[in-house]
Amino acid sequence: MEKRIALIGTGGTIAGQGASDTDLTGYTAGVLGLDEILASVPGTQPYGPYTYTQFSNIESSDITVKHWLDLSKLVQQLVDQDDIGGVVITHGTDSMEETAYFLNLTVHTDKPIVVTGSMRPAGAISADGPINLLQAIQVARTPETAGKGVVVVLNGYIDGARDVSKCNTTNVATFDSPLVGHLGIVQDGIAHYYKASTRCHTKDSEFDVRDLKELPRVVLLTCYGGMDDMVPMSVVATNPDGLILTGLGHGTIPQNVRQITQNTKFPTVRASRTGSGMVSAVPQDTLAGYLVSDTLSPQKARILLMLGLTRTKNLKKLQQFFYKY
């Protein structure tokens, strides 16, 4: 018998409903259950059998660290079962890239894990949820998806969890990997791959959250022209476990902010607000005690630092995580 695909619903626009079929922005996310979403998707039966879990039904902007921990544990339990061949998760697009990266670092498996969603609610004209879910299932059923880590599937494209970003507020072609490009495409019911991530993930990851109930508190602070001292001073005063500084350009930190955030008792990572490119170490980082995010977005750098702090507080070892993952 064919192994089952485990379907997990978390909410989001794919489960949303608007006041009319032309309401593309004022709708309510997380209304429909997973069973109702599936009922709107023709052509899924040949790719079964399935299991179904309604994990949550929320807007993805409301996702919490506890949600990530609980979802990771659920996915791990599922992939550890011999009769499960892969996992498909429906999720809101606003924080999809973060959830996908968290699972990419914390679920230990070779089995396909696919995250999908939609940019238009279920009742909208030309809703993209049904085709995205069908193609996500097709990707999970494609043998070549095994070992690729967590992937995100929308609009016919396959992206790796590490590098994918939401790049448009409303367009259905919102997901891209600006620096490295898509891993592949979905065509005629099959995933076609043209590249793979070279960074460690899933089965090779050293991060294990199965016994954790919380994670270190890491704060993200965005820098901008004309930034005064008040916000960085307030953040430092809360004494977080870690800080991601989203700098300008090549992660550049304004001098006044640097004076406040350098050589703190907690690790501080420089990232960039540009959306693409590498933040590399410079001599001033050693003086300030800063780490660098490599090519991770600020929000993903936050996730990696949270997980890294569960393993070590050594700055050199933490920096190596950013080069490894």
For each predicted feature, which ranges?
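Accessory alpha-helical/coil subdomains and C-terminal extensions
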Residues: 2-4, 8-12, 20, 30-44, ...
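A short helix->loop->beta-strand "cap" motif at the edges of active sites that frequently abuts
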Residues: 84, 109-112, 264-268
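Short Gly/Thr/Asp-enriched flexible loops that form oxyanion-binding sites at enzyme active sites
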Residues: 89-111, 253-262
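Internal gly/pro-rich beta-alpha loop/helix module
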Residues: 115-187
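C-terminal non-catalytic interaction/assembly regions of soluble proteins
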Residues: 250-325
